[in-house]
Amino acid sequence: MKKLFVCALAAAMMLAAGCSSGSSSSSAPSAASPAAPAASQAAGSEAAGGDASLTTVTPGKFTIGMECAYAPFNWTQLEKTDTAVDIGSASYADGYDVVMGKYIAEQLGLELVVKPIAWEGLEPAVNNGEIDAIIAGMTATPERRENVDFTDPYYESKMVVIVRKDSDLTNITSIQDLSGRKVQGQLNTLYDTVIDQIEGVDHVTPLATYPLMVVALQSGEVDALTAELPVAAGVVASNPDLTYVEFAEGSGFEADTSVSIAVKKGNTALLDAIQSALASVSEEDRQQQVPALAAEGQVIHRAGRL
């Protein structure tokens, strides 16, 4: 079964390589907006019924929520491919989280359904029974643990900043070198709150999605964006006028950058089942695939989201 997961990710990367030259539209609307399609049915396992001990939102289906605008973890595209999932309105979701969701659904004997949901709506959606789980590059912060239960991390990254390639910030070595500069993060995420670790920073009001943030950076409204490395790599691969800066240990942000899967508080049966599926894929396989997807320029992909 582990081989299925790795092969699916390899397929996603090959498809991306053939399409990453598509048009890049920085002003394209995000799939994570409130107007995003409400639901989708996806090609997952054809098994009927699945694990009888599991109760899911829709019997026989594993329904997950994600932004569908956070490449390389998840994004929206217009083409139907082997790894993509139909989300309605002639659009498809793809990315690491989608492949992960497919693999887990396969292990549970269920069919995968993906719902595009704005970031701030993900926790309410899992708690009100709209979705079974959140697979969206989400970090298990203490605050979130009060509202939902998390699996062990399925990927661990590190935090960087994205800057314009012609900026004098390309050679900085510490986050404190950003003092006095305009720095922006994503709304309601760790990537916004950590900005205050920079002394004297001009903490710009966060935006909801990276497509909007990239526009702000390219237009000069802000000097730098915070992001985790795979996302930054994807942004840079799609936007040759941008680059990202990594920091040595002790000079960067102090933050937990691991990501986990969330379920409704107290849904132990589903949590344990998902955890078991994750355990069947080695940490090495999980860690290697995200950077590979990012390197293929996944941020624009076929839909040109950034």
Model feature map: region roles:
Residues S21, A48-A52, L190-T205, Y244-F247, ...:
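Ligand-binding clefts/hinges and TM-proximal coupling segments of bilobed small-molecule sensing domains
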Residues E106, E111-D177, E254:
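Acidic, polar ligand-binding/catalytic clefts
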Residues C19-A32:
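Bacterial lipoprotein signal-peptidase II cleavage site
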Residues E156-V163, A237-L278, E296-L306:
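Periplasmic-binding protein-like
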Residues S20, V98-Q107, S167, R181, ...:
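Extended ligand-binding regions for polar small-molecule ligands
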Residues M14-G18:
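C-terminal motif of bacterial Sec signal peptides marking the signal peptidase cleavage site
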Residues G49-G137:
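Extracytoplasmic small-molecule ligand-binding "clamshell" domains
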Residues E120-G121, G137-N147, V194-Q197, P211, ...:
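A ligand-binding cleft/hinge motif common to bilobed small-molecule-binding domains
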